Amino acid sequence: MGEIQGPVRVRFAPSPTGYLHIGGVRTALFNWLFARHHGGQFILRIEDTDEKRYVPGSADDLMASLRWVGIEWDEGPDIGGPYAPYVQSLRHEAGIYRPFVEQLLESGHAYMSFTTEEELERMRAEALAGGVKAFRFRGPERDWSLDRQREMAATGRPYTVRLKTPTEGVTAFRDLVRGGERIEFRNEELYDIVLVKSSGMPVYHLAHLVDDHLMRITHVLRSDEWVASTPYHVLLYQAFGWEMPAFAHLPPILRQDGRGKLSKRTDDVAANRFWERGYLPDAMFNYLALQGWSYDGYTEIMSREELIERFTLDRVQPSPARWNPEKLLDMNGIYIRRLKTEQLADAIAPFLARAGLIGDPPTPDERAYLVQLTPLIHERLKELGEAPELLEFFFREVTLPDPLLLIQKKMDAATTVAALEAAHARLAPLEPWTHDRLEAELRALCEELGLKAGQLFGAIRVAVTGRTVAPPLFDTLVALGKSRTLRRLEAARAALTTHAGANVQS
């Protein structure tokens, strides 16, 4: 990529138009890793110049989503910095952009356009009807003198400010993700984009570029959907006479089937949804780092420190990444298994509290019990949000949806009732109530009853948990305790007796 001169400064500049897309988190992450790798600064800036699409509260949501993943900024809207404010609407109110608009008008690189939306639509329709494949608007006012433009504006007629694009030659830039490849656009294929709306609000193309210059941004890492807009940005840098930042356009993330990009409209890709479902920040951080970047082609599990050390743009692939929810789920499971018991207990506590199983925060007794239960699901858990369903029967009484679930293979209602009665009788006097004693007594009971372990253990499992699949049986019985175990065995026996009718002798 070449030697970087001076301190690296990058930015992530989302628009508060709703929840933060997971692809946006990936873009922020690549910026953050690049800055940290080079000992530079990562800046967060809110670009809210699109008043129609602005969603109140979404700026707070996107900051919370970034912080959840572990992305902190060195300058930003909530912590300030030397180039505050870091919200474009506030910068507009402060009059930051107006002098630069005047500079473009004075130099002839921009002009006031008085063409209305209705006129523009009519011109577009006529051009397309005439066989033009792509309508490229260049307003008649581009040839007016600035004095004439100002005279028209003085009459009160609404206007936008447009960039006066050249009609000949090419506009080019180099892209670091493509190995510094020179990307060219023929100027005749450009059009005069709007820089300032009729409301006076600057649009993204102008506002972000002025902000990048004033905030001394050295590298612009952004989605490759902005490649087509980059020639306009290059023309603006040239018009101002400013040094351009280095550009790196990141590959899109496709759906798992490869049919199109991940989309807010059709895919469950809100960053906060992964938070709510119980993905660990470290797992999401690791997985997103691999969405378009690879260290050596096979190493996948890497710590934040390793990713910072290894991340370089020459390892970012220009071809699209592909979203794989199963791989993310597996990676989350790996990170969950790396947690210590108390760490996992504390991580799942909010999910159990949300389900009404424990308090928020849990009492000391609740936390101690949760620490006891956590090893029972530690190896099985892939999302923290699965914990309430897996552990619910430890906190609430069991209601059998169908007593016939108690009956195991090659058993009937009568033998199942008898087995439950025998288990209750065998366990009632048992002391101490430990894993080894429970296993020894119940295995001995299997032999006495002529049952296979799976038959007796399966019936007991359903009786005490209400489900056919549950954590290891003897650990479960220890965690439930003697009194609850015996009570549930008796309740299950009674339920099956009632359900099966008079043919079952108690």
Swiss-Prot record:
CDD domains given in the database record: GluRS_core
Motif stretch ('KMSKS' region): 261-265
Major subcellular location class: cytoplasm
GO terms, biological process: glutamyl-tRNA aminoacylation
Presence of keyword Signal: no
Location in or out of the cell: Cytoplasm
PROSITE patterns, per the entry: AA_TRNA_LIGASE_I (PS00178)
One Pfam family this sequence matches: tRNA-synt_1c
Keywords recorded for this protein, A-Z: Aminoacyl-tRNA synthetase, ATP-binding, Cytoplasm, Ligase, Nucleotide-binding, Protein biosynthesis
Residue pairs linked by disulfide bridges in the UniProt entry: none
Catalysed reaction, written as an equation: tRNA(Glu) + L-glutamate + ATP = L-glutamyl-tRNA(Glu) + AMP + diphosphate
Nucleotide-binding found in the keyword field: yes
The protein's Enzyme Commission number: 6.1.1.17
Residue interval(s) of motif 'HIGH' region: 14-24
Signal peptide residues on this chain, from the entry's feature table: none
Positions of transmembrane segments: none
Enzyme class: ligase
Molecular functions (GO terms): ATP binding; glutamate-tRNA ligase activity; tRNA binding; zinc ion binding
CC annotations in GO: cytosol
Subunit structure: Monomer.
Entries under NCBIfam families matching the protein: gltX_bact
Cited function: Catalyzes the attachment of glutamate to tRNA(Glu) in a two-step reaction: glutamate is first activated by ATP to form Glu-AMP and then transferred to the acceptor end of tRNA(Glu).
Protein's recorded name: Glutamate--tRNA ligase
Source organism per UniProt: Roseiflexus sp. (strain RS-1)
Name of the gene: gltX
